[in-house]
Amino acid sequence: MIKGHGIDIEELVAIERAYLKNARFAKKVLTEAELSRFEELSGKRKIEFLAGRWAAKEAFSKAWGTGIGKLRFQDLEILNDRQGAPYFSRSPFTGKVWISLSHAAGLVTASVILEENDES
């Protein structure tokens, strides 16, 4: 059963401005493992990665029903599988977490669905 669905959309330029203004911005948003991957990237791809993680974590917090505030960015970790698909490797939700990210026209969108485990 679906517990929640959250969507977020961000402008890449807004995330880039925040990052350029304060280098600690990435450390606030990203876990150690995410930061390691982030530091391997360069240019536009680096900003897309950071914006994608930001949007996905915001979308999760909306699906969870708390928003960021009751939930910290560090409570959530998104890694990529062998095919490059993102997945939540850390979250407070014990069920299945579905995530979709898309980048286009200077925007990133994230959709997160929380599905409770069947207990029947």
Curated annotation (Swiss-Prot):
Q: Where in the cell is it found?
A: Cytoplasm
Chief location: cytoplasm
Superkingdom of source: Bacteria
User: What's its catalytic activity?
Assistant: apo-[ACP] + CoA = holo-[ACP] + adenosine 3',5'-bisphosphate + H(+)
**InterPro entries (alphabetical):** 4-PPantetheinyl_Trfase_dom (IPR008278), 4-PPantetheinyl_Trfase_dom_sf (IPR037143), ACPS (IPR002582), Ppantetheine-prot_Trfase_dom (IPR004568)
Q: What is its EC number?
A: 2.7.8.7
Q: Do you know which Gene3D superfamilies this protein is assigned to? A: 4'-phosphopantetheinyl transferase domain
Q: Which family does it belong to?
A: Belongs to the P-Pant transferase superfamily. AcpS family.
GO CC, sorted alphabetically, is: cytoplasm
The secretion signal range is none
Q: What biological function has been recorded for the protein in this entry?
A: Transfers the 4'-phosphopantetheine moiety from coenzyme A to a Ser of acyl-carrier-protein.
GO: which molecular function terms?
A: holo-[acyl-carrier-protein] synthase activity; magnesium ion binding
Organism of derivation: Streptococcus sanguinis (strain SK36)
Arranged from A to Z, the UniProt key words for this protein are: Cytoplasm, Fatty acid biosynthesis, Fatty acid metabolism, Lipid biosynthesis, Lipid metabolism, Magnesium, Metal-binding, Transferase
Q: Which GO terms describe its biological process?
A: fatty acid biosynthetic process
Q: HAMAP family, per this entry?
A: AcpS
Q: Which cofactor does it need?
A: Mg(2+)
What are the binding positions for Mg(2+) in this chain? 8, 58
The answer to whether the entry has keyword Metal-binding is yes
Entry keyword Transcription: no
Q: What is this protein called?
A: Holo-[acyl-carrier-protein] synthase
Kind of enzyme, top EC level?
transferase
